[in-house]
Amino acid sequence: RTRPLPFNLVLGISAEEECMGENGIRALLPALGKVDMALVGEPTGMQAATGERGLVVLDCTAHGRSGHAARGEGVNALYIALDDIARLRSFHFGRESELLGPIGIAVTQIEAGTQHNVVPDTCRFVVDVRTTDAYSNEETVGILRAALRSEAVPRSTRIRAAAVGGEHPLVKAAVAAGRETYISPTTSDRTLMPFPALKMGPGQSSRSHTADEFVLLEEIAEGIAVYEKYIGKLAQEYGWKTLG
């Protein structure tokens, strides 16, 4: 007697990240038809990431007026930017996600001026915003724009926060398989999936985007064993089919 799985499994392998081009998961999903749920194989140490924050990158520009530094002329765009950056460091949103926690804000780049004796009329800085389901990405951008003197332009608003609740079979199966659940601080293709998904895969997220990024062979072996156990637990959640 055999026990086929009570669902179909489709393996999708994508080489593009969620923030890159259109030939990765964006091209794959329309070809799959209806999808009920997904398991995303990003490196998590084979623990179960039940949610992840979204991402909005803001290109900000402070506008001033050029002048000679010795004569105290002009309006220093760098100072305007610094005031905005200080405001961002202590900024708090009115709502906080129960699953994903607070929205994260980090200024990661700044550029101003070309000469030591000229007051800069422009200062550009970049803000990395890790969004949650407490606000849409568009709402988050609007709130931050209202708080800043600088112009703020989002590169994209499509990388959205995502989470799956503890009562979903994806999560219940992970717990039954002995996996710890947590909220991932990083984004993945999960954010582009309009259906419940869990992130769990071999390797360590701390190695991502580093020189000579790698996954150990023993981590792959562990991953295979965990996936087998997990799929079995997930099948139990949906009820095994038995053929006589």
Residue spans of the language-model regions?
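Acidic/histidine-rich catalytic neighborhood of metal-dependent amide-processing enzymes
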Residues: 1-57, 61
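Metal-dependent amide/peptide-bond hydrolase catalytic core
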Residues: 15-17, 43, 48-51, 57-244
